[in-house]
Amino acid sequence: MRLNLYHLLVLSFLSLITLFSCKGPSNSGELVGARLNKLKANKTPYGMVLIPGGTFIMGQSDEDITFSQTAQNRQVTIASFYMDDTEISNSEYRQFVNWVRDSILITNFLGDDSYFIESSSGERFIDWNKVGKNSPWRSNDENARERLSSMYYQGEDRIFGKNELDVRLLKYHYEWFDLRAATSARGDRTKSRSDFIIRDTMLIYPDTTVWLNDFSYAQNEPMVEGYFSHPSFDEYPVVGVTWRQAQAFNTWRTRLFNNAASSNKTMERLPYQLPSEAEWEYAARGGKVGMQFPWGGPTARNARGCLMANFKPGRGNYIDDGNAYTAPVYSYFPNDFGLYNMAGNVAEWTQSSYNESANSFVHDMNPTYTYNAKATDNEALKRKVIRGGSWKDIGFFLQNGARQYEYQDTAKSYIGFRSVTRYVGVSN
């Protein structure tokens, strides 16, 4: 018995040697490949759902009642991607605002080196673990409280001496590499990499005055004062955010995850960004063919007569769906992909620039049309596609194929956004 066990161990050892020798050592002179870190499986990002790739007919699914012909039908193919299951909420966007607020306080005002860590190259970075455990905003130290008071409104800007954050200080600097511009100039040897790095600095606090700007002679002051700052609205969609602010948010969100991945020695994620309008429409349809709405159709009510989304069902009637303004982001039933409020609640920014005939000339594989408009460009070049309709829109704009636009520097009380990120590999 002991001899048989010995023979078994010897055979097992020889089998392992044979197995590993078949793979070919790196110094064998054979082409064996240089593999990157092993990735067991794509993990769905928190708060997102996988949108499996497929093909669909993009454009109007019903009569073009305005006869605008801006959403011509076209069969296209979309690769797999991840998408937020809801619109970005006030609480999620506030995490971004608080990060910028704390960064500015620690870097420019606090003067406390204990909130920094130093890398091996000598660079200093904020220690976010310490910020989370010992936030300077909760400090009882008299010197620290005096320094952080610099971030409040000062002098005549104060009301009854109340400490209120001066949101004009909340600016976020971000950078990104313009791949399309670099590709177009790939044969130009006079260009360097820095020529294609776009740098921008944005005020990132939402414009709360949109509730008054968008509606004349309407008593919306309570929404100005509480919509973004009151905890009752935490799970409502953020509004008053421009297209450029949404871009800044996605850059920050990408860095937030990738910095954590670097610390944990795990795989980084491809950038978060706004969906193209083709991706948005494909996701909104939820795999249904030729349907008007994310839930199917042909009406905006279910068999019991209940409205399926938050919109304006009749003249002067905003509240038949149960909400006078926006609704919480998990309201109503999701579509077949698990996405909430792809019709109504708030219209959503997309990555795509608006062109009336875009459906006619974009590619039939992952179609998109983008243009990085500068401040000096013509206003028509600053138009960005918005999709889905909103709480103040009539039912026509809730259709999957309905297209609208808004200018990239414009904030509205009825426009929000959600993010996507790429699925790496093949999903089926």
Regions found by a protein language model. Name each.
Residues 413-428:
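Short, structured beta-strand segments at or near domain termini in extracellular proteins/domains
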Residues 2-9:
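Bacterial N-terminal signal peptides that target proteins for export
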Residues 19-21:
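C-terminal motif of bacterial Sec signal peptides marking the signal peptidase cleavage site
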Residues 41-230, 234-246, 344:
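A short glycine-rich, aromatic-capped structural motif
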Residues 36-38, 70-71, 371-374, 403-408:
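Short, P/G- and charge-enriched loop/turn segments at secondary-structure junctions
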Residues 23-30, 50-51, 57, 62, ...:
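Functional-site microenvironments in short loops/helix caps that host divalent-cation chemistry
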Residues 25-41:
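N-terminal pre-domain segments of enzymes
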Residues 10-14:
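Hydrophobic helical h-region of N-terminal Sec-dependent signal peptides
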